[in-house]
Structures are given as C-alpha cells and as structure tokens.
Amino acid sequence: MSDEMIYGDGAIRRQGLYGSSIENTYAGVLSFMRRNYSRDLEGVDVAVSGIPLDLSVTFRSGARMGPQAIRAASVQLAELKPYPWGFDPFEDLAVVDYGDCWFDAHNPLTIKPSIIEHARTILASGAKMLTFGGDHYVTYPLLIAHAEKYGKPLALLHFDAHCDTWPDDSPDSLNHGTMFYKAVKEGLIDPKKSVQVGIRTWNDDFMGLNVLGAPWVHDNGVDATIAEIKKTIGDAPVYVTFDIDCLDPSAAPGTGTPVPGGLTTAQALKIIRNLGDLNIVGMDVVEVAPSYDQSEITAIAAAHIACDMLCLMRNKKVAGTL
C-alpha cells in the first residue's frame, strides 16, 4: 500500500520519510504530528525527541510528562496545513520522531552524559534536533552537544520568565535555574550574541546576555522585539530554547514555575514565525507540566510553537540554507 493510502497509525506504518497519512485526531499512535517513529536517521532533516526529566525543578514537578503531552496535543496540527504557512512541511522536510532519551533517573550522575550522548548520536547523522522537555536543565547538555557539532560559542535565543543564570559552580548539580550561568562560564554561548525574551524575575547578574524583558516586549511591541533579536544575533549559529513559562499563566498554566505578566501566545508565535533569517542549529520546547494544565492549552501552545519551528526549517531547506 502506498503511503498516501494509509489510513491510521502512519507513525508505524508509513514507509517513506515524506508526506502525511490520514488519521483520526482522537486515535492512533502519538508521535509528534504523526511522523514516523524511527531511529533510522538516514536522510532525516530534523529528529524530534523527548527528554522526560524533571529532577532539577525548584517548585512544581511534572515536566517529565511534557513530551507525551506535546505529542498528544500535536495530533490536531497534523490534520491540516499549518496556519499561516499554507503548506504541508512534511512534503519537503524529512522529520522523524526519534522517541525519548533514556536515562537512569535513580543514578543522577549519569543523566547529563546520557543526554549528551543522545544528542551526539542524532547530530552525528546530520539531522537537526527539536527536543521536548522535561525541565529546562535539559538544555545544558544539549548545548554541550550542539557546541561540539557547530563550534563554540553559539548564540542563544532564550524565551523564558526566568534568566536561568543563577550562580552554580558544581559540575554535578541538576538545577533548572543555572544552565546558562554554566553555559557562559564554559564558553558554550556568547552572551553578546544571545538574547533572552520575556524575562520577569530578578537576578543580580544576567551574565552579559541581552535581556528583552516581558515589560519591554509589551511596551515596544513584537516587531521591535524581532528587530532587536535579529540585530543582536546576526548570522551566528543560534540555539533556540523556549521555556513555556515565557507565556503568561493565563495562556500556559501547565508549567512548574509560572510568573504573571508574560507574553501572549499570539506574541510568541509571531516572534517565532519571523526567525527565518537566523542560522538556527537546534531547538527545544521545555517545562510543559500537564498536571497543572487547563483544557490542554499549555500543551497545545507548545505544539504550535514546535510546529512553527519545523515550518521555519522547511523553508530553510527549500531555500537551500538548512
């Protein structure tokens, strides 16, 4: 049977990497946007994977269920061409759902190496990564692997309510509020080329990163925010990380450390959709904690953000710049 004639469970029945199958949105295997579940990365442009870790949270746990929730929320996006793009990204972009990173949660010292090796395996194939957390700590080992692949320092585009640059000089700690302190100290990211968007918690030392706080975004507007991001990052290889608590709790209650005054979903989506000029080398969406969600609106927002990231990658491939 040809792939276009498959009805249901295309994630495990589809033979090719491209195109979409016909699915019921309320049934079937929950890969991200119904992509093939596969660890075969030959010819793959982007590998989606999850890191179900929430051992480093400082308030509410539950982000370990984030990858599963984002996949479940994505099924409605696989039914139609994404708005406002007007195309099926999977006609041109080869995307697989690689499954989840395995780690031993009862042996914390092995978690960081496990995530690094997971990322190295994917990046060595030539595929780019779109990763779902899990808490935000996962971005730190992902940055290590991406800096090995693409050279350091990288630029960082960081959407969040928190700066995550609180001091932490322990090499073995698991803390979702200190990753970018370590990333700057270790030369993984260039603070002068990095931008944090949506910040609305205080830190005495922002480590030299350029901060566009949530009040700044509200006062100056989305277009000015996009312009500042592009001006600061330029053509540097950039890793994009989106902590869902960048959004206001009214739009994303399902997260571990919500902070009032955040971006609206519309603001965030417009920013993401206008990042096509950036040299994006890796992406993640983290901190979705579905046990605190209402009507799945947080997971749905995360799935839309991730879908827009893939649409950016599709356009880059079509333009020959992926």
Curated annotation (Swiss-Prot):
Pfam families: Arginase. Transmembrane segments: none annotated. One of its GO terms (biological process) is putrescine biosynthetic process from arginine, via agmatine. This is Agmatinase. CDD domains: Agmatinase_PAH. Its EC number is 3.5.3.11. It comes from Chromobacterium violaceum (strain ATCC 12472 / DSM 30191 / JCM 1249 / CCUG 213 / NBRC 12614 / NCIMB 9131 / NCTC 9757 / MK). GO terms for molecular function: agmatinase activity; manganese ion binding. The gene is speB.
